[in-house]
Amino acid sequence: MTSIKHLLINAKKYDQKEFEIKAWVASNRGNTNIRFVEINDGSTIKNLQVVIKKEIMSFLEVDKIRLGAAIHVKGVLKYTPGMAQEIELNADKFILLKNTDEDFPIQKKETSLEALREIPHLRHRTTTLRAIMLIRSTLALEIHKFYNERGYLWVSSPIITGNDGEGAGESFVVDDESKDFFFNKKATLGVTGQLHAEAYALGFSKVYTFAPTFRAENSNTTKHAAEFWMMEPEVAFFDLKDLIKMSDDMLRQVIKRTVEAHPHEFEFFEKNKPGLLKNLNLFLNNKLSILEYREAIKILEKVKDRFEDKNIFFGKDLATEHEKYLAEKHIQGPVAVINYPKSFKAFYMFQNEDNETVAAYDLLVPGIGEVIGGSKRETRYEKLVQRVKDLKINQEDLQWYLDLRRFGQASSAGFGLGFERLIMYITGTENIRDTIPFPRTPKNMKM
C-alpha cells in the first residue's frame, strides 16, 4: 500500500503503473458516463482523483458514497502534467469500506476555524487543519534531527513537578482528592523543563527537552493555551553569544527543511495569507542582527506615535507590536535583543555587572515578533539565593537546583521555544488553538 504523497513525488516514474490505496472520500462528482471521486489519505493536502467507469461500479452505488467515507481502490496511475490534476487513478476495483452518516459535519462548504474548534476529533479532516498538522509533525521531527545531528541528549523532563520554574505561581495543582498529599508535598503540572535540563546538562554537556507544559493562566487570547509544547535546550559552558548562534542555526535549518518538505502545503498557506513566504524568506535570507535592549528602547521612543502602546521606557517589557517593528521595519530581518532589565526577567538569569540587566535575549522575526527567549544562567550561588529571596520564591523547593551551583556548574545557557508559536509563525495561523490537535484553554476542554 502506497501513499498519495509518494505517488505525487514520483508521478512521472509511476505513469501507467498499477497501485492500490485505502483512503477517505474528499469529493464525489461526475456525469452519466463517468464518475470522479477525489480521495485523501492524510499524507498530503493534495487529493487523488479516481476515475470510475460504469463497468467498475454501479453509478447508483457510487452516488451513495458520502464525503469522509472510507474506500479501497486499485487501478492504473496516469501522469497528466499541465492539467488541474497532476495525476489520476483509473480504477479497476473500487470498494466502499465504510460510509459516513448523513450528519457528518465536514462537508465541501467551507466551515470557519471557530466552528471547527467545536469538533476537535474531526477537524483534522479539513484541508486547513490537515496542512497545519502535517507541518507540526515535520517541524517536531526536524527539531529532533537538528539536535541529534549535533550530539545532544534528549531528556524526558517530568510532567509532575514540585517547583515553579518561572516563579509566576500560575500552576495546575495535582490533586488525588485524598486528605494527604500523594507525593507528601504539593505537586503541580510543569511550567517548564528547563530546571531539570540544567541538572542533566551538568554531566551530559548538551541536552534538550521537548515536552508538554502547563500554565493555569486565565487568558483567552489567540496566543495563549493552558497546555502547550516547549522545546528547551541547555548547554554547559555556553555563553550568551554561543546560545544565540545555536538558536539561529536551529531555526534556519528547521524552517528551511520543513518548507522544502511541504511544497503543496506552503502553496496553500501562501494563498490564505499572501506575504507569508516573503516573511519567511526575510528570516532565512538575512543575517541575524544583535541589538541591545537599551538601544531598542531608544529606537522605539523615536517612533512611539505609530504604536497602540506609546508608553515606552527603560524597564518596559516589549509588546508584540514593538517586537514586530524592530524585526520588520528597523532591521528588516531577524534580530536578537539582548541584556534586558532584570526587573521583569526570571530569577535564574545571569546578572550583568551593571546590576540592572541580565544576560538574556529574545529572538524576534518578521511577521510575529518573539519566537525564542533565552539566557545565560546565574551560576554564582550567593547571587542566585539572594535573587530567590528578593522575589519571595520558596527556597526549600528549589534547593536542589541551587545546589547545582555548588557541584560543578561553571556556566550554562539555554532557551525556550514555544512550539505552537513556531507553527503559527511558519503557517500564518492566527490562533494557537488551531495549531494543537486537542487544545485546552480556560473553560474549554472538549475531550
Swiss-Prot record:
Transmembrane residue ranges: none
GO cellular component: cytoplasm
A Pfam entry, by short name: tRNA-synt_2
GO molecular function: asparagine-tRNA ligase activity; ATP binding; nucleic acid binding
Reactions mediated catalytically: tRNA(Asn) + L-asparagine + ATP = L-asparaginyl-tRNA(Asn) + AMP + diphosphate + H(+)
Top EC group: ligase
Localization, UniProt: Cytoplasm
Family in the record: Belongs to the class-II aminoacyl-tRNA synthetase family.
Subunit structure: Homodimer.
Name under which the protein is recorded: Asparagine--tRNA ligase
Gene name of this polypeptide: asnS
